[in-house]
Amino acid sequence: MSDFEPFYDVSRSYEDNYEQGPFGAFAEALKDGNGADAAGTTSEGASEGALATFLGQPVNLPFGIPAGPLLNSRFTTAAFHMGFDLATYKTVRSRAWGCNPFPNVLAVHPKSADGSLTPGSAELDEGVLADTNYEQPISISNSFGVPSQSPDVWQPDMRAAIEAAGPGQVLVPSFQGSRVEGMSEEEYIADHATTARLVKETGAKLMVMNTSCPNAVSYTHLRAHETSLHLV
């Protein structure tokens, strides 16, 4: 690993990152209050100098961090302080949802010198070497299972994350529905709506539905292929 210290520490569990993170420069930004207003100035009524808009919201620069590594309000606030004007709050659910077993992130090492995978290569069937040798440049594979705190935890924390946005900055909540054993398709769709309503209750001005994990229900049944569900 290089001297660069990531703000999400892959050598720690997801739970430890949630409780103790962020790390590195993000931790320093959170401690020192560098960058955007560290006092938690809200962006409402204070974005006259914004240079662009994102889904109708004024932003300084429509560039940020997508759903994934910003686990809670400490992470999103640190991202704001580091100058990312769009910070996406890690995908939430209508219920608590555990993380997949550790380790959740591994470096992958294709055999080719340039790191590419060739059509027809045996690696496509046999897999590639995956380990904790995080050398630069780096390619990774990850498996978290889209964990979530319960709404009793994430709703107040999301409110704090929204309030920490500075002028020209926007907190973007991410959400998804949860499919559990015995749930009908109608109930699955309704769970998406329930989770969106829970997000709206935090005062969020916009939100994004996470469809990046189409195999979250079954490794052989991709929900994203079912246009009949009318999730959007």
For each of these PLM feature ranges, what is it?
Residues 1-170, 177-180:
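N-terminal capping/small domains of soluble enzymes
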Residues 71-79, 188-197:
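Short, acidic/polar
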Residues 86, 206-208:
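Residues at the N-termini of beta-strands
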Residues 154, 188, 192, 228:
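Aromatic/hydrophobic pocket-lining residues that form the small-molecule binding cavity
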Residues 175-177, 210-213:
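Short, structured patches in soluble enzyme cores that scaffold and shape functional sites
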Residues 175-195, 223:
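Short, electropositive alpha-helical surface patch
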Residues 220-227:
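Conserved small/polar residues in nucleotide/adenosyl-binding loops
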